[in-house]
Amino acid sequence: MCGIAGQVGRDPRTIQRRYAAYCAMQQTLARRGPDQRGMYICGAAALIHARLAVVDLENGLQPMQLDWQGETYVLVYNGELYNTPELRAALAARGHSFNGHSDTEVLLHAFAEWGANCVPRCNGIFAFAVWQQNAGTLFLARDRCGVKPLFYTQAEDSLIFGSELKTLLAHPAVPPRVDANGLAEVLLLGPGRTPGCGVFQNVRELLPGQYAVYETQTARLTLHTYWRLEDHDHPDDFAATARRVRDLVTDAIERQLVSDVPVATFLSGGLDSSLISVIADAHFTAQGNQLQTFSVGYRDNKKYFHATKFQPGADAPYIRKMNDFLHARHHWVTLDTPELVPALYAAVDARDLPGMADVDASLLVFCRHIKPHATVALSGECADEIFGGYPWYRDPTVRERYGFPWAQSTAYRASFIKPGVLGGIDPAAFVDERYRATLAQTSVRPGLPAAEQRMRQMMNLNFKWFMQTLLDRKDRMSMYSGLEVRVPFCDYRIAEYLYSVPWEFKDYHGQEKGLLREAMRGVLPDEVLWRRKSPYPKTWNPSYLAAVSTELRTVLNDPAAPLLRIIRADALETLLASGADNPIPWYGQLMTTPQTIAWFLQLNYWLAKYKVELV
């Protein structure tokens, strides 16, 4: 993985005078790409790259240039293609030759050959930009599921783009201004974001499954959707569906093991990470190599953990079961409060926004521990969104309730906001508008029963909102340590197929992700295969709640704290007084009282560190 950035415009003088800005933008990408840096400045274009070398370490340098049939193409690219051999063969048949075996070179030739039509041919996770020197156009594209980020804005009669928000903010033409709508995104929806919203004024994010063309002579930006979830007839019976799922999942995992650097897997002892680890283990064992697996836990969690309906049991027994089952070398990573609290702020630096509190911070530290052992890791994200694993898919009360199922607390959130901070924005209407817009974008084939229509809506809501929040988290926290994390369940072929699968198949035998479990029968030990879903682990140690409470009291006692300009101090006092007993989660299943307190710490830090101008 890497980081990309750039600016293209009508007037070459604008580009030539911004070299210092490009150096600053490149520096913001140093953690994403610690291995090599490159910059292309010519005429009206500047393309910037910071590389994390994973494939073809010698020949994959960027920006990469190709002269083909009278045009000069320059590429900067962040991601991995998982069908590189097929693309290379198709291009070779059309007369293309290659200097190395990198997917970067294949992607560049693919664009030169097929133009925008190359994007649907790609299976992978990517965000890339191609400058066509003679045509004076910039092409931007993002993968179907939104695994890799790409932000942009129009300023100085030009287009400025980058992998992260901080990259754009390093440019003098992009001030850290946040208007009422942007602030409402943070306070009412965060850590989620409206698809395409960059929070900062005039900053947008290219949507998953979208590409854009910017014409420098007219300053015109045109957006195109090349992929979306579409509902189709599903003729397969359950047995055929299970076979297809097994083939798709196995192929997706095996394709994502390609690397010229060490590869590891996350292992929680849950269904998704265990499946990935088993298939990866077989792959490496067949090659005479040993897989490395990593698990995260917290000091004294065995002492303080108590089961809930969301977290029915601890991970450790199942991790040990998998350790015995695999041929891998396993690493236990144990986190503690003194490490977690400072990481709350590093997590904001990584995400450029308040995030998921210690759910972010713990992942950041976990990835930091993995990096000395591996450059690439595979993780089980997105299986729950696609196979229907979350409680809100299965609990009819929650499923049929109006609104985002992971964020039923708009009134509670609004109770913290000082009057007038959001201008004339009505919190309930703001959230409702986005919910209704997503429902309206849901593909439902004619004649589908109402219950199945609702399940299509649920998958679309989760795919466009909740999954994007988790993918943001995974990308920013891992890349902050220069670790590339791949997510096999985000293979678009799996999402396409599963979207139209009847709910009775997905919920086979009334078990969450029953279809996936049945499809992979015999691959895992039964205790792991049929284990109830348990989410990403968090600390239960009361020392963490005490530590973040102390930090928030320090903020409350600071009259200059930016948090207090927008948040009611009395509401924060009430939150602190509730201890661990507040039943209202801030977001999802995991962000209860300790995480909500930590989120306000992140909000205060973000306002100060990023010098946010509220306009």
Residue positions per predicted region:
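Amphipathic alpha-helical interaction/coupling elements
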Residues: 106, 244, 248, 252, ...
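Phosphate/ATP-binding catalytic cores across multiple sugar-kinase/actin-like superfamilies
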Residues: 243-265, 369-373, 377, 470, ...
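Conserved glycosyltransferase catalytic-site signature
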Residues: 103-104, 123-125, 180, 274, ...
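A mobile, often basic/glycine-rich helix-loop segment
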Residues: 387-412
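Short secondary-structure boundary/capping segments
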Residues: 308-311, 347-349, 391-398, 615
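Adenosyl-5′-phosphate
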Residues: 1-4, 23-27, 42, 72, ...
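Short acidic/histidine-rich active-site segments
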Residues: 374-384, 388-390
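Cysteine-centered catalytic environments shared across enzyme families
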Residues: 1-345, 350, 363, 521-522, ...
